[in-house]
Amino acid sequence: MKIFDEICKDEEILNRYLEVEKYEEKNKGWAYHNFAHVNNVAQMVEKLLRNLNYDEQLIENAKIAAILHDTGANLGKEDHAYRSYLFAKEYLERKQYPIENKEEILEAIKIHSHNFNTNSILALTIILSDKLDVKSNRISEEGRKVVGNRQYQYVKDIEVKIENENLIIQFLMDDQFDLVELEEYYFTKKIFHAITAFSQKVNLKPELFINQKKWISSVNFIEN
């Protein structure tokens, strides 16, 4: 069994994310940072890196970073990346898993909320995959009341593929969404930043669409 699979089945990790769920339910978080979310991130990380022909060790390490990256959200979103780093560092040391380049995993966890300037492909893939997990089922009832954030409740799916040196991202939306409000929201700008940083690192041209139509504002943001 791979280390990633062992971690996913570890009761300590599963219980940790139950703590995250309980905290977010009690404190009315806007989006879930639960096990379902980190598993979504791990799947997207694997898809992207495999399509770019990265080696199995890097893919495994990126998935480990993905599954541990929100373990610090049990005390809220603020500073959760650093708390997740501290938890992951202690956890991996205690488990004594034979992991190569463990520091790169830990660094990716520590910077996943904000650092778009890193040169680490592992970290950039985590950051992008994390930011793209904004589908409707991740948005809480409280989050559906918040201006800007509420627009993500209309995201039915996000399709990502790499084709002919292009990174193609298709947002499939319900018709009720407000494009202006979506574009002005701070987190949408973070999504654009993540797409830009990742694309530049792997020499891909990003192309974003909403319901099969080119997302014009995203093009202007990314090109500038």
Question: How should each PLM-predicted stretch be described?
Answer:
Residues 6, 19-22, 90, 107, ...:
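Charged/polar, solvent-exposed surface patches and flexible loops
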Residues 30-33, 117, 183:
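Non-transmembrane, amphipathic alpha-helical segments
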Residues 133-224:
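Terminal helices and disordered tails flanking the catalytic cores of nucleotide-processing hydrolases
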Residues 50-162:
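Divalent metal-dependent catalytic cores for phosphoryl transfer on phosphate-bearing substrates
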Residues 1-80:
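Acidic/His-rich, divalent-metal-binding segments that scaffold phosphate/diphosphate chemistry
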